[in-house]
Amino acid sequence: MTTLLSFLTSLCSSAIRQAFPELEELTLDITPSTKEHFGHYQCNDAMKLARALRKSPRAIAEEIVAHIPATPFSSIEIAGAGFINFTFSKEFLANQLQIFSQELAKGFPVSSPQKVIIDFSSPNIAKDMHVGHLRSTIIGDCLARCFSFVGHDVLRLNHIGDWGTAFGMLITYLQETAQTDIHQLENLTELYKKAHVRFAEDPEFKKRSQYNVVALQSGDPQALALWKQICAVSEKSFQKIYSILDVELHTRGESFYNPFLADVVSDLESKNLVTLSDGAKCVFHEEFSIPLMIQKSDGGYNYATTDVAAMRYRIQQDHADRILIVTDSGQSLHFQLLEATCLAAGYLPHKGIFSHVGFGLVLDTQGRKFKTRSGENIKLQELLDTAIEKAKESLREHRPEISEEELAYQGPILGINAIKYADLSAHRINDYVFSFEKMLRFEGNTAMSLLYAYVRIQGIKRRMKLDTLPQKGPLSIHEPAEETLALTLLRFPEVLDLTLRELCPHFLTDYLYVLTNKFNAFFRDCHIEGSDYQQERLYLCGLTEKTLETGMHLLGLKTLDHL
């Protein structure tokens, strides 16, 4: 769908070319108006052109406006030094809503779908998922949903840590304690901690662990059998969390790339990209002060080798057009080095294919890194369980008469929605404060606020005995609240574009929060049932319902018919 922003950009671009043909190409600065009384959109380019054209911004604005057709607008005004304020006509907005309703059902398909690989979540085998995995899982899932919605072919990869020294330690510990049936073990994480202590304190244990790493890499049957059982137990616990979060992933761990590591190093050497540094094989880049080490001095490979092999495989075998890796911002330098290496080797054809989607920390209410009182990472399973229980407490407080059956159904939805929305509504680059009290509020920019607006629409349907609301048909706009709601609905595809361009879900959460506020104002100001404009207003309700439902789905949130 052609968004209002792209439509207006095209008009202004054409007008500037006609008014000032001597100008070279320029990037236009057109934005939604900051205040409603300024109109719908604002063009600020007259100020930028003043120096090049040696004219006043206002005179430039007047010439631009003279070349813009008046038909789609109710007004085009020049304000201040040369701001051009555009207000679309009500008839134009009504016609655009007809197109919007059709495109919304299809998902605003892109003209050139791509193969997009999104690598996210990626916990380590034999360790509990903790709050640090929450952001990667939630952000990655949201981006995957958005890319899929507009028609891209998305592969969701879980690059789990299923190889390395840790497994040598675990296998050795299990052999020592004669525990060969891992499925009988309740807490693999505790075993890992015990094995880690032995590894650090007992040189003989460390030696046997290193031997078992080699045995595992060589395909020793006993070592492989134990490794497979360890992975199966861990993946089962991961899947429990993914089911709660309603997240789908295809597991392709680090071990998958083992057969390709030697060839990757050899290929980089053949391209004269490798330098020996203290016995280690490294790839140096002029723009970075440190290299990417791809083979240790003892001949072993590391996670950087695996990442290079994974990048090559995803381009050459998966035929990816874009690759996103969602991890904390602390790994930014590593991924810059990885991209530079893969570009130099030709594994990435050009810049822009790969993006590291970094994110900040989760903090407690004191502004410290979110941990237990003893300083350990908070287990994600415990965090989700607590969210569900606190959501149930909130429901009991607001509805003392709620049945246990309703509580059991609604509690998990409200709790998980709250956690997801609180995370996604924060700019992913920023740290954010985790507060159950704030995220479970019924007012403000919360999941509960979105859900309340959606439930209000369901109430309209029940009260008027309607199974569904109209999402197409003739529409006339009469009241300011109708016009504002129509304009907000039409901004959904451009917000989706922005979310995908910047890889930032908070643009979508901000939009949905604004939409709920505009709908609530419409509901307050515009009588629906029995009014002269009942059908048109039900149409606006129907489009709001579908847009809210779609937006919440893209965030990974679930809806309810009542609260």
UniProtKB/Swiss-Prot annotation:
InterPro entries: aa-tRNA-synth_I_CS, Arg-tRNA-ligase, Arg-tRNA-synth_N, Arg-tRNA-synth_N_sf, ArgRS_core, DALR_anticod-bd, Rossmann-like_a/b/a_fold, tRNAsynth_Ia_anticodon-bd. One of its GO terms (molecular function) is arginine-tRNA ligase activity. The keyword Protein biosynthesis applies. It is found in: Cytoplasm. GO terms for cellular component: cytoplasm. Keywords: Aminoacyl-tRNA synthetase, ATP-binding, Cytoplasm, Ligase, Nucleotide-binding, Protein biosynthesis. This is Arginine--tRNA ligase. It comes from Chlamydia muridarum (strain MoPn / Nigg).
